[in-house]
């Protein structure tokens, strides 16, 4: 080993250039990462494939500017040097560096890191007077030469660089190392890879135009690091995340300050950032530092409805009381991602630029500003949705600069809109690769899968001793949970069992299938399709606990006192099960109700044998219901919340067109199953936290901020109810009492308002969170995790592995594999939280898409389906917000139009526009015209007309128009008593199976012809079904207008178990 010194010029935390001298050690033996290695290097982890024609070594500039091209999976045999890696780490942002790390860690990319600066024959010290850029390029070239010689010339090496001097100097130095530009490389080696060529031209053009010609500054410069550091410590500056109000994207954004970063005790709300100038080039989601403006410059949030998302027009006298207002002084971390945009109409482009090469494109997301891109394909991209990426936003530019990536498709087409939703939510779900499918077990008629005898002997066999059954939606194929309940000998104890598909038996940790599942983190359910987390051979077959077949399971078995139902003991472990009955919810409920119904599994039996089996099944269902009621009562005592919601699903005709949107009726058996799943999740959480106190994956639900309950409290007060929000128990009791016997919808709306106040339930590692914060507020449980849906949630896969490790520790056995440390688990938890949020948003957006499709082809003035009953649940300066229970919609209803006319109501309740005025109060709004006055109160029923508001650049939206101040005559009476519906919190537990099985039901009824890809990957491309399942959390997110007056869009959050 050789010791020397290395001189670095780094940026300090205060933004200064610092000269650093570090000890530098070099040695002969450094892993090369190639499968062609001739020197027996100790290569650990990924190695480069031998099935490539060459290896490619990009220099620092290429890695810095053209990383997107290197991320294409078609490019193989990439050797990233330590020189390039560390330079990017020090000179580019964290997001760019994390992308580079992900590229190296992902086994699907044929790319390795070569520590060239530790290899004594590869590293070259910096020469006197040599620029840092030249030194870096020379080091990368030396690494390429060393690599070629190390492999004994078995593989040509191509170094790509944008340094023309380097190309001239090195191109003829070594016959086995070729030094060429990025463009020459793509033309010579990848002439047919159009995606790479498009990216190159777009990025290169943007880089050429980045140099500014001395234009005047539009925005103030960001503050230097040393000023920021001192200001944050003193409390002058506040750090937080910028959230843009999509309804007034040019004017309103809010910063939710993080923790106690500010010492300003007056800050009990978010900080308003008013106008683009004060936003100072920050984009929605950026981590920013802000400075509060003087108090006399504080402004209030807009209290009026805006006509359409992103609508901008003057709104006098419609602001709330002044609130803390600030300006952005620095952007700590960019949240840039891929954006879907639409080019403006051709005539508008001509006015922007004569040559139509520099164009302002409009993002699909209202919260993102217009982006300037350069393209020579402007005419061809008309009416297309395209993806762009941001490159820079200089202080001299009104808009950020970006570059074109690729075309998604024609605007308005179903497939394009679905792909837009996926891109906007950063969801990447390609078909499972051949390598991943090769890891899967085979189960065909010719080669049926069989259980392994050693595996069978190591498990507890419940096949003959337990009556196991599943309760799922009709047609469910991916059954990941089953139940059992029986009276133990002696009659003094019951045994309750929850049996979950043993996914971890088939998905080995670190396998390609496991890595893909980790990347996806969840199964994505859209309105017309799903993207599975696992291949179909597992999710719909070998991991599905179907009736009448032997399956591996992970089980939790409780012994309960037969009278008190208190837990006497609990057992965790791997089992063998055979489900006797595959029931659906309606069938199970009918059996419990004493109705004469047909159980398919009992059809072959006759007489007394059939009666005996039916009696056993009924007894099990009744006992299970009794146990579930007890479990729910126990949680209720602790303060579990019952938050109301509406589920809606679509009915289709034979041509797969939506014919109706139908609310789904809740059943007690739904909650029975959910309570058992919650109980299993809770006990597994206790077990893994006790065994691994510093690195167990749990799920907590933090208590909401009290100010978020203001809307709920004020609305309830207007109707004569008092809501106590000091604890979850107090809130639950208050909501239970807030019942209007004349209108059950009042209670349901109050529960929805409570949902909007809730924070998100999140995964976390126990070593990263104080124990007092483990509590799940909504479920009223001290410990909670997810264990019961490993087919669809990667969090459950992690928990299964932790549980088995805990069981092994109990037996004084070492876990079969090393478990993730706290840091790794916390990073993974954050990844899963982000993906879950993306899945939720994408499902909500796809439902909205299909709701618009349902109403789009209907004449709102003649079709009675476009007229519906609505309930007022919030009052604004120029209208009110209404809920349409028939379709599960929320939206804005305007009482004042652009011309200043207001709604006038005649004697029959019909509405028309007339000159007049509005007066807004906390619980009502009064319209006054020459014909009289009319008052609209909170919780009044009115009649609205639903129509579609088309948009060229954004998603279509639904418009609610008031046509009568009276309830709609066709509205159906509420059949459900207030407070008696399914809990929105337990909804998530059963929602997974419902969504998937509804698709299976549709498929069975129609028996569509599937393409080869659909059969293999079970990821449909054609619109073969529409499933619109809406739970309480999604109803909150569907609110079309509430975000105008909340601090930020994220304040309308979900509450899920």
From Swiss-Prot:
Residues 998-1017 are annotated as: Disordered. It comes from the Eukaryota. Residues 459-807 form the RNB domain. It is found in: Cytoplasm. One of its GO terms (cellular component) is cytoplasmic exosome (RNase complex). Keywords: Cytoplasm, Exonuclease, Exosome, Hydrolase, Magnesium, Nuclease, RNA-binding. Residues 359-425 form the CSD2 domain. Its cofactor is Mg(2+). GO terms for biological process: mRNA catabolic process; rRNA catabolic process. InterPro entries: Dis3_CSD2, NA-bd_OB-fold, RNase_II/R, RNase_II/R_CS, RNR_Ribonuclease, Rrp44_CSD1, RRP44_S1. Residues 1001-1017 have a biased composition (Basic and acidic residues). Its EC number is 3.1.13.1. GO terms for molecular function: 3'-5'-RNA exonuclease activity; exoribonuclease II activity; RNA binding. It is an enzyme of class 3 (hydrolase). Residues 230-301 form the CSD1 domain. Disulfide bonds: none annotated. It catalyses: Exonucleolytic cleavage in the 3'- to 5'-direction to yield nucleoside 5'-phosphates. Its main location: cytoplasm. Belongs to the RNR ribonuclease family. PANTHER family: DIS3-LIKE EXONUCLEASE 1, RIBONUCLEASE. Component of the RNA exosome complex. Catalytic component of the RNA exosome complex which has 3'->5' exoribonuclease activity and participates in a multitude of cellular RNA processing and degradation events. This is DIS3-like exonuclease 1. It comes from Danio rerio. The gene is dis3l.
């Amino acid at each position: 080993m050789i010791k020397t010194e290395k001189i670095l010029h780094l940026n300090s935390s205060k933004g200064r250039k610092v000269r650093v001298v570090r000890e530098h050690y070099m040695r002969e033996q450094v892993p090369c990462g190639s499968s062609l290695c001739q020197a027996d290097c100790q290569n650990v982890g990924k190695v480069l494939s031998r099935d490539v024609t060459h290896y490619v070594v990009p220099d620092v500039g290429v890695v810095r500017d053209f990383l997107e091209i290197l991320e294409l999976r078609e490019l193989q045999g990439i050797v990233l040097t330590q020189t390039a890696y560390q330079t990017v780490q020090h000179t580019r942002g964290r997001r760019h560096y994390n992308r580079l790390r992900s590229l190296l860690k992902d086994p699907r990319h044929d790319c390795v890191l070569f520590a060239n600066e530790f290899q004594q024959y590869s590293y070259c010290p910096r020469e006197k007077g040599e620029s840092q850029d030249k030194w870096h390029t020379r080091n990368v070239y030396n690494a390429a030469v060393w690599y070629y010689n190390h492999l004994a010339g078995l593989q040509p090496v191509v170094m790509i660089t944008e340094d023309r001097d380097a190309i001239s100097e090195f191109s003829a130095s070594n016959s086995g190392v070729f030094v060429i530009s990025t463009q020459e490389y793509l033309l010579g080696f990848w002439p047919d890879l159009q995606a790479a060529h498009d990216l190159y031209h777009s990025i290169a053009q943007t880089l050429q135009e980045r140099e500014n010609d001395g234009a005047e500054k539009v925005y103030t410069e960001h503050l230097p690091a040393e000023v920021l550091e001192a200001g944050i410590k003193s409390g002058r500056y506040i750090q937080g995340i910028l959230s843009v109000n999509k309804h007034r994207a040019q004017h309103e954004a809010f910063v939710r300050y993080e923790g106690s970063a500010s010492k300003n005790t007056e800050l009990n709300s978010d900080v308003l950032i008013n106008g683009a100038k004060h936003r100072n080039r920050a984009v929605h989601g950026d981590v920013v530092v802000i400075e509060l403006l003087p108090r006399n410059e504080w402004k209030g949030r807009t209290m009026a409805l805006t006509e359409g998302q992103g609508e901008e027009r003057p709104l006098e006298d419609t602001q709330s009381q002044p609130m803390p207002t600030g300006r952005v002084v620095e952007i700590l971390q960019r949240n840039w991602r891929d954006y879907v945009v639409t080019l403006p109409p051709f005539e508008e482009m001509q006015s922007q630029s004569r040559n139509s090469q520099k164009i302002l494109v409009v993002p699909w997301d209202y919260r993102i500003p217009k982006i300037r891109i350069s393209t020579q394909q402007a005419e061809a991209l008309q009416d297309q949705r395209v993806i762009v990426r941001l490159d820079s936003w200089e202080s001299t530019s009104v808009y950020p600069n970006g570059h074109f990536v690729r075309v998604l498709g024609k605007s308005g087409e179903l497939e394009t809109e679905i792909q837009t939703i996926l891109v906007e939510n950063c969801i990447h779900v390609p078909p499972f690769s051949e390598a991943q499918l090769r890891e899967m077990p085979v189960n065909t008629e010719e080669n049926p899968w069989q259980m392994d005898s050693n595996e069978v002997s190591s498990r507890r066999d419940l096949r003959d001793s337990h009556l196991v059954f599943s309760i799922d939606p009709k047609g469910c194929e991916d059954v990941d949970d089953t139940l059992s309940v029986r009276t133990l000998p002696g009659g003094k104890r019951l045994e309750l069992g929850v049996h979950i598909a043993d996914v971890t038996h088939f998905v080995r940790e670190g396998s390609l299938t496991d890595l893909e599942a980790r990347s996806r983190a969840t199964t994505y359910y859209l309105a017309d399709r799903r993207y599975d987390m696992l291949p179909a051979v597992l999710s719909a077959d070998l991991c599905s606990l179907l009736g009448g077949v032997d399956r591996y399971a992970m089980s939790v078995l409780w012994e309960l006192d037969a009278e008190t139902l208190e837990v006497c003991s609990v057992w965790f472990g791997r089992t063998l099960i055979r489900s006797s009955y595959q029931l659906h919810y309606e069938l199970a409920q009918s059996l419990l109700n004493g109705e004469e119904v047909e159980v398919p599994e009992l059809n072959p039996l006759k007489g007394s044998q059939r009666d005996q089996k039916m009696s056993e099944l009924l007894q099990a269902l009744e006992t299970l219901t009794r146990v579930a009621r007890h479990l729910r009562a126990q949680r209720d005592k602790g303060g579990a919340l019952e938050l109301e919601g509406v589920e809606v699903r679509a009915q289709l005709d034979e041509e797969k067109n939506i014919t109706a949107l139908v609310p789904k009726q809740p059943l007690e058996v739904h909650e029975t199953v959910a309570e058992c799943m919650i109980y299993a999740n809770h006990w597994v959480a206790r077990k893994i936290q006790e065994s691994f106190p510093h690195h167990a994956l749990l799920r907590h639900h933090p208590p909401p901020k009290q100010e978020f309950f203001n809307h709920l409290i004020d609305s309830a007060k207007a109707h004569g109810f008092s809501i106590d929000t000091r604890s979850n128990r107090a809130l639950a009791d208050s909501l239970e009492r807030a019942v209007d016997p004349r209108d059950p919808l009042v209670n349901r709306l109050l529960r929805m308002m409570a949902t909007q106040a809730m924070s998100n339930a999140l995964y976390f590692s126990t070593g990263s969170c104080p124990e007092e914060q483990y509590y799940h507020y909504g479920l009223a449980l001290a410990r909670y995790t997810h264990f019961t849906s490993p087919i669809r949630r990667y969090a459950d896969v992690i928990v299964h592995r932790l549980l088995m490790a805990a069981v092994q520790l109990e037996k004084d056995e070492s876990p079969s594999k090393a478990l993730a440390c706290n840091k790794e688990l916390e990073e993974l938890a954050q990844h899963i939280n982000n993906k879950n949020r993306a899945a939720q948003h994408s499902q909500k957006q796809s439902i909205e898409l299909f709701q618009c499709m349902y109403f789009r082809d209907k004449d709102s003035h003649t079709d009675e389906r476009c007229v519906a009953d609505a309930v007022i649940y919030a009052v604004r300066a120029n209208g009110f917000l209404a809920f349409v229970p028939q379709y599960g919609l929320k939206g804005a209803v305007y009482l004042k139009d652009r011309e200043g006319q207001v709604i006038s109501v005649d004697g029959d309740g019909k509405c028309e526009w007339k000159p007049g005025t509005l007066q807004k109060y906390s619980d009502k709004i009064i319209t006054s015209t020459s014909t009289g006055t009319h008052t609209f109160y909170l919780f009044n029923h009115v009649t609205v007309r639903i129509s579609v508001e088309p948009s060229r650049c954004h998603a279509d939206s639904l418009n609610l128009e008031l046509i009568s101040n009276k309830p709609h005559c066709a509205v159906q009476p509420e059949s459900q008593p207030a407070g008696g519906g399914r809990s929105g919190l337990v909804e998530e537990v059963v929602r997974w199976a419902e969504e998937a099985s509804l698709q299976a039901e549709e498929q069975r009824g129609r028996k569509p012809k599937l393409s080869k890809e659909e059969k293999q990957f079970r990821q449909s491309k054609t619109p073969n079904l529409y499933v619109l399942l809406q739970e309480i959390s999604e109803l909150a997110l569907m609110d079309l207008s509430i975000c105008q007056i909340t601090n930020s869009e994220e304040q309308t959050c979900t509450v899920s178990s």
